[in-house]
Amino acid sequence: MKEVVRTEILKLLEVGIIYPIADSRWVSHVHCVPEKGGITVVPNDKNELIPQRIVTGYRMVIDYRKLNKATRKDHYPLPFIDQMLEILSKHTHFFFLDGYSGFSQIPISQPDQEKTTFTCPFRTYAYRRMPFGLCNAPATFQRCMTAIFSDFCEKIVEVFMDDFSVYGTSFDDCLSNLDRVLQRCEETNLVLNWEKCHFMVNEGIVLGHKISERGIEVDRAKVDAIEKMPCPKDIKGIRSFLGHAGFIGGS
């Protein structure tokens, strides 16, 4: 786990997202948590099959609970998913854009940077840019993205956090809309992750749903995951199943 932390620290230092800090009234601790992929089933001590997420690696996280407890909560809302999907499903051509390292594109004011201080086996650091783990990070990011694209939303693009869905009723219409969105990204220094972008497609997965001119469908991968789940044997298993089934039911 120490190497996981070392690798992440060196990466963040290299790009200037964090910097060493000598002292702070706010110090949070680092942890490593498993990164999980798909779902498999494994036998328990009673030889019953139970669902289990596949661990694909580990990542560094910071426990900001102490800071979050003292933070005044920002209740800025996220967009209504069903309304977004309804708008998108009425179109035939799409560009799906992805923001690069989402939260880290938001700078933190100098006086507040020391509040993000964290300690690890090497030394103590603070963030210049917004890290994951802060209770107001999602609201702050959504507010920023909405402000950037406020005059485009519900017209040529739908914005959910760092997922930007550009749409149009024809090839030329969608291409023109993309040009306007990319110009806005350049004007505001918003960086995109081209490797995760999909250009000029007739359908795509948005927030776990497949959208196209045919309408809104559930992502088949979600259905397959439920079909592979064994019959729940206890309360934990029932909750897990209901969580997955509720997603389908809400669709």
Predicted regions and their residues:
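Retroelement reverse transcriptase polymerase core
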Residues: 1-251
